[in-house]
Amino acid sequence: MSETECGRFSTISRETISNVERQLSQPPSVWLNLTGARIIENEGQFDKDIALPNNKSHVTHIAVDIGGSLAKVMYYVCESSSPSSSSSSISEAENYTGGRLSFMIFETAKIEDCIQFMANLIDNHVKNCNKKKITLIATGGGAYKFYDRMSKQLDIKVIREDEMECLIMGLNYFVSCIPREVFVLDLDTCELTFQNHLNCYHYPHMLVNIGSGVSILKVTGPSQFERIGGSSLGGGTLWGLLSLLTPANSFDEMLELSKGGDNTSVDMLVGDIYGKDIGYERFGLKSTTIASSFGKVFRERKPLEEFAPQDISRSLLLAISNNIGQIAYLHAQKHNVQNIYFGGSFIRNHVQTMHTLTYAIQYWSNHTMNAYFLRHEGYLGVFGAFMKYATSQPSNVPVPSIS
């Protein structure tokens, strides 16, 4: 080989070398049969485990999505294992029929609890498998912030994946493969109507992901999307302000407080301005329409302790939900999108939140746009991360890429 020919090797770019190293470090893809998948209905929580009765493969992956407020874990257990126990193995045997996808959620402020949970999963699994075969796929900002800690404490391969790509991939799989996952809310009866993905999953559509903040993604094809907007006023805003204004210690406690609240004791309504039972009919504003969130607080000049925590919680929840709903509508109008999917742990399948978002979309669009929700709305990212390294049946679910 001549000196010139040898010199060609020095022209390989650093980016090319990094790409090759990345491909070599990737774990082998696991097989996951999603045919016949169903949500397990005989459990208390709404974000239930997903049964995979036809999966017979050995699954050695764990996925985690670590956001600013919450960390979500997804893992696979065989059907004989307890889905809620931290001692459950990831996959207990080579020869068994069926299993389930299980989900857990932790506060990011208590990330050590999350890491310990994953460590317990791994330790139990090591009894049946070489630890080197186990891979953690991490996404979200915490995948970078806590990368060194997870790698050191878990002592397994940790791979980081793009947050937005995982969100879209998770949405694709939930909508395409999981029956009774997507639904709409009736504004009059608050009844849920589950959707057939063939009827509702059209392009373009929008994903409004509401976590600590809000990201709005426009999906233009089976594997193309772009981030078109967002807001800093999201779940973290609600959590932070209610931590200051109420005795609630967790997000779920805040949502529970809001269920028993009366926002009219703190919100100024159209009727408070025009007179009781009088609205602004010219613009379709009923007397019960909120004119100013927290508008009565200054006017009444009462100390904080004289306002019920329940009323404050409901008012702030409505304020943030209304704001997100209107922003979502404006982006959908600008980009000519009719179908809007709402995801993220802020929603928590909370009826008042979904009702407010649905009302905002229908009101501002004059009923020309649709608001869709998911039962696993907080797990889009972690599901997408999990499926990044899985070969699935059905095999026609698209893999996203940033536009």
From Swiss-Prot:
Organism expressing this protein natively: Schizosaccharomyces pombe (strain 972 / ATCC 24843) (Fission yeast)
Protein name: Pantothenate kinase
One annotated Gene Ontology cellular component of this protein: cytosol
GO molecular-function term, one example from the UniProt record: pantothenate kinase activity
Pathway: Cofactor biosynthesis; coenzyme A biosynthesis; CoA from (R)-pantothenate: step 1/5
Free-text activity regulation comment from the record: Regulated by feedback inhibition by malonyl-CoA.
Pfam families, alphabetized: Fumble
Highest taxon, organism lineage: Eukaryota
